[in-house]
Regions:
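Sec-dependent N-terminal signal peptides
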Residues: 2-13
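Aromatic/hydrophobic beta-strand junction motif of beta-rich domains
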Residues: 318-324
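Hydrophobic core
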Residues: 14-18
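Acidic, serine/threonine-rich low-complexity disordered tracts
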Residues: 23-136, 145, 172-315
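Cleavable N-terminal signal peptides
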Residues: 9, 20-22
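Low-complexity, serine/threonine/proline-enriched polar segments
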Residues: 133, 137-172
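Poly-acidic low-complexity segments
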Residues: 2, 20, 66-67, 142
Length: 325
């Protein structure tokens, strides 16, 4: 029964692995997909946030946890595990062009590395030990609006039985699993500029490919589904995370096709990303992360010049506007 529960947990965690520009592109390179509709309805607001510009090596660090309490309660297994605590390290690794929907599209490649573990020894059907989950996520995100084109997640789940402490030398590898989700068109988690009261909906195709190896977990079959998701900017204010510059963040809440809430992001313009996120995953998992550190790459000065008359005779006096940021 313990192995069965751990297997189910591994599969559930696997499902967890479900934002006019001016660029100084020192690193730039080229790497296919169809057209669908997104529906936007806008309302009045008191503040807005435009699409941020990321740089290679921009980094966000989060503390967080996976709340597995509801899943455990429904599993029928005797255990005292409630959450797996950990951290998430998110970095912009690259910027390049790739083919999306028949068009050359500028994208970010973003890597997230998460490490989670039980709070000391737990019990699963009478066996004590520590449960660990390591995750690596590679996301391809469209530069123009931070829409997600794909996510590839590698999940490593293992259990250390208790023997004078949690014994790594007795470690049981539950499995290493890989899941890749591709969204066509890319999933618009934000509709910039963000403003309170705005809502939008997308119909899209989601292709999911599975691979990996495990002695306990059956690797799921690949799938392709039609889905619909909607979002709403429900408020602007304090997310509850005391991070400097983020006291006027935007709460963007997501809903499934039945109108059920599936999670939310608190978008903070000052950190060019989320200060807090809460997402309900398959099997009742809840993933919660809060920002603890934002390390942007130093932005260089950008000079733009506009002239009164782009075409004019030589040797005449015209006006020009110079902007330095």
């Amino acid at each position: 029964m313990r192995a069965t529960w751990l297997s189910a947990m591994a599969v559930a965690i696997l499902a967890f692995a479900q934002i006019s520009y001016s660029f100084s592109l020192d690193d730039f390179h080229i790497r296919d997909s169809s057209s669908h509709e997104s529906h936007v309805q806008a309302m009045t607001t008191t503040g807005t946030a435009d699409v941020p510009i990321w740089r290679v090596n921009d980094n966000w660090m989060y503390d967080g946890f996976l709340d597995v309490g509801d899943f455990v309660a429904d599993s029928g297994v005797s255990t005292n595990v409630e959450t797996l605590d950990g951290s998430l390290d998110r970095t912009v690794e690259d910027i390049y062009l790739m083919e999306i929907g028949g068009k050359e599209t500028l994208v970010y490649e973003v890597e997230s590395v998460g490490e989670y573990e039980s709070d000391g020894a737990i019990q699963i059907d009478g066996t004590s030990g520590c449960l660990y989950v390591d995750m690596q996520t590679i996301e391809i995100i469209r530069v123009s609006d931070l829409a997600t084109y794909s996510q590839e997640v590698t999940v490593d789940v293992y259990f250390d039985p208790l023997f004078f402490g949690c014994a790594a030398w007795l470690r049981q590898d539950i499995g290493e699993l890989v899941v890749e989700n591709t969204y066509e068109p890319p999933l618009e988690n934000y509709d910039f500029p963000i403003s309170v009261g705005e809502s939008w909906r997308m119909d899209y195709e989601q292709a999911t490919d599975y691979s990996g190896s495990s002695n306990y977990v059956d690797i799921p079959e690949d799938s392709s589904d039609s889905n619909s998701t909607s979002w709403s900017v429900v408020s602007q204010g304090n997310s509850g995370v005391a991070y400097p510059g983020c006291y006027q963040s935007f709460n963007v809440t997501a809903y499934d096709s039945d109108g059920e809430e599936t999670g939310y992001n608190w978008f903070c313009p000052a950190v060019r990303g989320e200060v807090k996120s809460t997402m309900e995953q398959a099997f009742g998992f809840l993933a919660v992360h809060e920002l603890v550190s934002y390390q942007p790459v130093q932005r260089g000065k950008l000079v733009s010049i506009d002239v009164q008359y782009p075409l004019s005779p030589t040797d005449i006096e015209i006006s020009a506007w110079i902007n330095v940021t």
